[in-house]
């Protein structure tokens, strides 16, 4: 009708497809508040999600972008997601998740089937000789002895880690991939979806005709018609042999999982900011296989696994040129930790790391952070203030023990209190109760405090002489400390005199010798009677034994002079 406004032929609900990237993983509604947590394990216990603005029966592809749980509930969506992970060489994650789903459906009474399926899952995904190993942290490692008593929920923690990894890492890239955009376009145009795996990832409609070439012309090496390439290709667009595919899947998967699949612990407290860098590793690998995605991100560096004091973990990018202190500053600030009160250790090592060295030494390493409680201690008898650092689990008496032993005191001879207060503090309290405070240590009347013999920086701070404290706070070297010797040896040795040393060398070179009697001359050297030969007289002074006996004072005199000089 001329007077009737025209209506665009867009069915109700199509406009919701134009959403931003941030809206793909966030939903609204009272029922969808728990979807983004990634704590669901089984597809049968996944939440139903929020009420969709469009019917999911008519538009299943659009509903995949609502949440990762909705994608797993759709068999077709799960198949396309599996095909997407194959291109990223991480299909073993979803395969392991589906195997755990089937394993949980086995009745607990069927012990024979449980034992058989548990061994199959363990040997394929979890053992050290697994063909398709999944990347889980050490806390979730399982030994082969657990197979003796199989339970339907024995792989619950491992499945949760892989679920969180796929949700926060792979799913975010899937909803932005050309494969998903192609499915959305086909659904909007009313075309049927092709079977997953029938065409190359991100290819256009399979009905597109092959471009005609002039006689004698051919496509460049590695360029074939889109939609007709095999699922896995080698260099030049040729399909890989099965043996090579298995080798590629073993080596490439192991390398990519170490760098891009950082499922760290069961609490799933991953820093998504770092995982954004990790994803560029697989992006660049897809570019080398002929992917049609956009510009690749800059080449990422290696990563360091950081275990925080609260038991969670995070990934830190070990960028060249940054110190360990700079690398950990962002993580500590985000978690509300004070970096000066943090000690950094390699996992399995009790020696603290120096934070001023380059962070590339921690590439592909695991470190743990331990928090330290610091407070100031004022020694009124010595008129000194020291800074004490101790573990949060230690008590005040344990933290003060090095200071007390250093000055020859016992806990019964001192009183600890806050400035301006007379009420003494209980030495059995934890040091966390006096964090960042200043305390006063007084001695009882009649108790004399002795000055410490050892004035090293470590002991003056009240910390025990441990290797990690020496490595973290190296004592400053002063010129006097380079030549300073213990007080017990000062009376026995003297500083070497340069002029005396030069004179000594000159006398040795001139074949002279000294002892306590002065200069030894040739006329003064007389052999004792038991060394003289019976047939020789006084002329035996010039015999070789004379030279030998004369040479003895040289060595002895030289040694004695050197000892006295040193």
Curated annotation (Swiss-Prot):
Listed Gene3D superfamilies: 1.10.196.10, Phosphatidylinositol 3-kinase Catalytic Subunit, Chain A, domain 1 (3.10.20.90), Regulator of G-protein Signalling 4, domain 2 (1.10.167.10)
RBD domain location: 302-373, 375-445
Record-level GO BP terms: cell division; chromosome segregation; G protein-coupled receptor signaling pathway; learning; long-term memory; long-term synaptic potentiation; mitotic cell cycle; negative regulation of ERK1 and ERK2 cascade
Positions of post-translational Phosphoserine modification: 20, 42, 45, 199, 203, 218, 288
Polar residues bias (residue ranges): 39-51, 537-550, 557-566
CDD domains noted in UniProt: RBD1_RGS14, RBD2_RGS14, RGS_RGS14
Residue intervals of the RGS domain: 67-184
GO cellular component, one term: microtubule
UniProt keyword list: Cell cycle, Cell division, Cell membrane, Cell projection, Cytoplasm, Cytoskeleton, GTPase activation, Membrane, Microtubule, Nucleus, Phosphoprotein, Repeat, Signal transduction inhibitor, Synapse
Subunit description: Interacts with GNAO1, GNAI2 and GNAI3. Interacts with GNAI1. Interacts (via RGS and GoLoco domains) with GNAI1; the interaction occurs in the centrosomes. Interaction with GNAI1 or GNAI3 (via active GTP- or inactive GDP-bound forms) prevents association of RGS14 with centrosomes or nuclear localization. Interacts with RABGEF1; the interactions is GTP-dependent. Interacts with RAP2A; the interactions is GTP-dependent and does not alter its function on G(i) alpha subunits either as GAP or as GDI. Associates with microtubules. Found in a complex with at least BRAF, HRAS, MAP2K1, MAPK3 and RGS14.
Record comment regarding domains: The RGS domain is necessary for GTPase-activating protein (GAP) activity for G subunits and localization to the nucleus and centrosomes.
Identification of the protein by name: Regulator of G-protein signaling 14
Species lineage: Eukaryota, Metazoa, Chordata, Craniata, Vertebrata
